[in-house]
Design a protein with these regions (language model features):
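Juxtamembrane intracellular "pre-TM" segments in multi-pass secondary transporters
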Residues: 6-14, 193-226
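Conserved MFS/SLC helix-loop-helix module at the cytosolic interface between two early adjacent transmembrane helices
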Residues: 69-107
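Helix-to-loop junctions at the C-terminal end of transmembrane segments
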Residues: 71-82, 270-283, 373
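Helix-loop-helix hairpin linking two adjacent transmembrane segments in secondary transporters
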Residues: 109, 146-193
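Cytoplasmic helix-loop-helix junction between adjacent transmembrane helices
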Residues: 113-151
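Intracellular juxtamembrane helix-capping segments at the cytosolic ends
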Residues: 123-135, 328-343
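C-terminal transmembrane helical hairpin of 12-TM major facilitator-type secondary transporters
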Residues: 285-334
């Protein structure tokens, strides 16, 4: 019989085994990767179902919308119920939704399945607090950082994997392989995960209501959610339309779009250093540096657009992909540091609010970018990304408002 996890504030935790850290990082990466498999496959899906770029662009939009909904409705339940049960149920549901996507005969069913994929992929955000709960406070930052590296790597390598598999075996093979892998890792977690004692005694209704109170009384949380949402709108706009641009301008397949995921993976691999930098120089300063790096990267992409049909454009684009992704990830980790310090007794709910802002931004970015690309092309998408990045920087430069602290929301 597995033992329950005790309150880490009151009890010294044994060291979490290295294999379990690796498994949790792998799970977080695989779950969140499910959101992005479709992006390098859009041209293949469009050809298969005979759809234009604007219509097929609704696929990542619905997936991100499902994720945002799941963040708001399901992530807070990790404070109320045993996280082991929550993770395992979501793992089975995600594997089922991925398999259903693979066998769907038409776009309508693919869209429904993708929406469910988005909802259940939120298990990635259940894994992170689970890792924290199993770790003593003196080691928690290191362990959570390792799991976050797995999550961020999953986001970017998902495009590489789906791009190559889609190019050689078709888009349905991507989802079949993902479903099988998700089922396998869920079985392994069933064997390895301990039980967790729920952290909150609030009812489900009170738990949800407390999130509104948390957001209303913490100005820093509001600012973090909006600023990161703007940055991720730029992030999503770029990745949603990249495969379409490469196909139309360079006649390159999904594997080429996937290769850009390797360039972006550099940002994920540097994530642990951003947390240390936020501790050393302050998270506020790091959000400003990250937003500036993101905005400048997109501005340079805009200027480079005049050379879009030359051999120099793709290498320049690859370098700027690395830099803008580093900026977005730098801001995300720094914003997490800010909200955890702002609401230390409600980290799961604060994290849910921040990430809901992130993926509302990503949903909006996908939708806007699909329409911009369809009507005005790639340069319009990059102009949009530059604009929203500049707005995020402006927001981070504004002076901080005094936060109204309220412990009654806990």
């Amino acid at each position: 019989m597995m033992k329950s996890m005790h309150d880490t504030h009151n009890t010294q935790q044994p060291a979490i085994p290295g294999y379990l850290i690796f498994m949790l990082a792998l799970t977080a990466g695989m779950a969140v990767a499910s959101l992005y498999y479709c992006q390098p496959l859009l041209a293949l899906l469009g050809n298969d179902f005979h759809l234009n770029s604007a219509t097929v662009g609704t696929l990542p939009t619905l997936t991100q919308a499902g994720y945002a909904l799941g963040l708001m409705l399901l992530i807070p339940l990790g404070d109320k119920f045993d996280r082991r049960h929550v993770i395992l149920v979501k793992g089975l549901a995600l594997a089922t939704a991925l398999a259903f996507t693979a066998v769907s005969p038409g776009l309508a069913l693919v869209l429904v399945a993708s929406f469910i994929v988005g909802i259940t992929a939120t298990m990635a955000q259940d894994v992170i607090p689970a890792a924290a709960a199993m770790t003593d406070s003196s080691q928690r930052g290191r362990v959570v950082g390792q799991v976050m590296t797995g999550l961020l790597t999953g986001i970017l390598l998902s495009r590489v994997i789906s791009g190559f598999i889609g190019e050689w075996f078709g888009w349905r093979s991507v989802y079949l392989a993902a479903a099988a892998a998700m089922l396998l890792v869920t079985i392994l977690l069933w064997r390895a995960l301990p039980r967790f004692t729920p952290a909150s005694t609030l009812s489900v209704g009170e738990l949800y209501r407390s999130m509104f109170s948390l957001l209303a009384t913490h100005a820093k949380l509001q600012k973090a959610a909006v600023a990161q949402g703007l940055l991720n709108a730029a992030f999503s706009a770029f990745w949603t339309t990249l495969a379409l641009m490469l196909y139309q301008n360079f006649h390159l397949g999904s594997s080429a779009a996937g290769l850009f995921g390797l360039a972006g993976a550099v940002g994920a691999l540097t994530a642990p250093f951003f947390g240390k930098a936020a501790d050393r120089f302050g998270p506020q300063r790091m959000t400003r540096i990250g937003a500036l790096l993101t905005g400048v990267s997109f501005l340079l992409m805009l200027f480079a657009g005049s050379a879009i049909n030359t051999t120099w454009y793709l290498p320049i684009l690859a370098v700027l992909t690395v830099s803008f992704d580093m900026g977005v990830q730098m801001c995300l980790i720094s914003h997490q540091t800010i909200i955890y310090n702002t609401a230390p007794h409600a980290m799961s709910r604060a994290n849910a609010i921040l990430l809901a802002g992130v993926f509302i931004g990503m949903t909006s970015g996908s939708l806007v970018a699909s329409q911009l690309f369809s009507h005005w092309g790639w340069q319009a998408v990059i102009a949009f990304a530059t604009l929203v990045s500049a707005l995020a920087l402006l927001l981070r430069l504004l002076p901080e408002r005094r936060t109204m602290i309220s412990d009654t929301v806990i």
